[in-house]
């Protein structure tokens, strides 16, 4: 073993500097944070050659006392904390006392500073960590620091610096983050003698967003906020039309500190998931104000990461705030189509699912998707069956129909299915009286329950609510014009033209119905007359084994049938008559290709695939009654505006929009 050497101070300082000062933008970040901590309201940043030759920061903060000028450049010298306890309640940008020491050890640094109580300031000049001089000087209140020839004495680091243009871009990016984080501070970035960025410190976040981005983005924002005991979450999220193919336009600030956090990003993106198309990322600026005791910022040399005491609660708070804001914005856009009176006819005074209770074993499935959705699709999604037959009679339960007469409105062919009877025997015909659900069984002797069950899953029946009648006023001022290309439904209502994508709309209806059934452990399966045997590769079989609970809880009954071979005996009833093998393999491939292993994300994609495969397709001709039925089912959804993949289900044109297109008005 080699001899252990004690490194000299110069070497240790350069090593430490490498952790804190990665590139010129790191210098800008550390120095601007010092200015902010000093209470500056105007901060100017000047750079040359991407900051490699010169970085100059001028602020009007409190300044540094003459007696502290030398101490400011010592390692671990700081005015932010006094003891270890202070680390757990940090309210400043900096606290370690490493920045000035690290910067001055790898550059030529000049600092001038004056406090208001002194008539003169102090100037200090340091090269490579060695003080060259310290003298009195005349200067304004505040601090001016110049950093030149960065890494001049560290050739290895200098060799790996990026181009001046790249470093300039990185500095511009970090200055823009400061502008967003501190709308009350005026920032001015000067590059090669020319003004590059300028903010005015108005205190208005929207002004800052417009300064950093552009007018289009600032005019397409949705405000959100949520305030709780120890935390406040607020900010702006962009509408779908300003989404991007990358996450560059996403900013997270925790107690005004710009950080990167995968779980916060995931919370926002999951809240936006059903409103965006695939491979698109939302614009957002999110602020999290939280008591310092509940976070730890001392987890990364550059303080770019934080840890939260309770990430689960944080995730939920952020998710709920963003999701509610987006839903509110979409509802406002389609107020005339989905007006409150029409929705209340279906949703107010509670549905029977909330009114009637049944002692039913619940299957707990860990899924966190739009949990507030009020699902009532193809018929009421009743999760609590009544014990009172008279109540069933009062709400208009029809006599039980045989399965031959149960006509699935959206399925071109009658489903070839078998139910199991009380003795679990496969029925050869579908007109007997003792049907029961294929799920965790409920043994009830009330014959009316069977009638309720069949009526509920007869997709041709109307949704069952306390108010049984359809909202007649909904159709009074609505005119169904027809279909365009057997794909888009054209509707006129209140002098507005609505175009509905029939596939996307039906897909969303099926998605919410199936998701609701899974969440409630209420999935109905159909036995296949001929089980489907699928041979899988070893990799595919392993993926199935890892996720077989997802298939089971989604209504699939799958058995292992030899090595890497499976036997599918049951599939979800909602699918109608699918191509079982193609559907199963589609879900399997989605699971394989997904980077996330989050249960909720996997379930979301699996359910979306099921819904997409089962929905009506483009070029399917629909009758007027079928169109009305689809609209009725959309009325029951809490978010009917986008399909599970984020595509819009409908778009709207006002009369004014059309007259502008035809140049009738300006």
Curated annotation (Swiss-Prot):
Provide an example Pfam family for this protein: MutL_C
For molecular function, the Gene Ontology terms on record are: ATP binding; ATP hydrolysis activity; ATP-dependent DNA damage sensor activity; mismatched DNA binding
Which keywords has UniProt assigned to this entry? DNA damage, DNA repair
The record's GO CC annotations read:
mismatch repair complex
Instruction: Return the PROSITE patterns for the record.
Output: DNA_MISMATCH_REPAIR_1 (PS00058)
- What's an example GO BP annotation here? mismatch repair
Q: Which Gene3D superfamilies match?
A: 3.30.230.10, Histidine kinase-like ATPase, C-terminal domain, MutL, C-terminal domain, dimerisation subdomain, MutL, C-terminal domain, regulatory subdomain
Q: What does this protein do?
A: This protein is involved in the repair of mismatches in DNA. It is required for dam-dependent methyl-directed DNA mismatch repair. May act as a 'molecular matchmaker', a protein that promotes the formation of a stable complex between two or more DNA-binding proteins in an ATP-dependent manner without itself being part of a final effector complex.
The record ties this protein, via NCBIfam families, to:
mutl
* Family that this chain belongs to: Belongs to the DNA mismatch repair MutL/HexB family.
For this entry, the protein name equals DNA mismatch repair protein MutL
Which organism is this entry from?
Answer: Clostridium botulinum (strain Kyoto / Type A2)
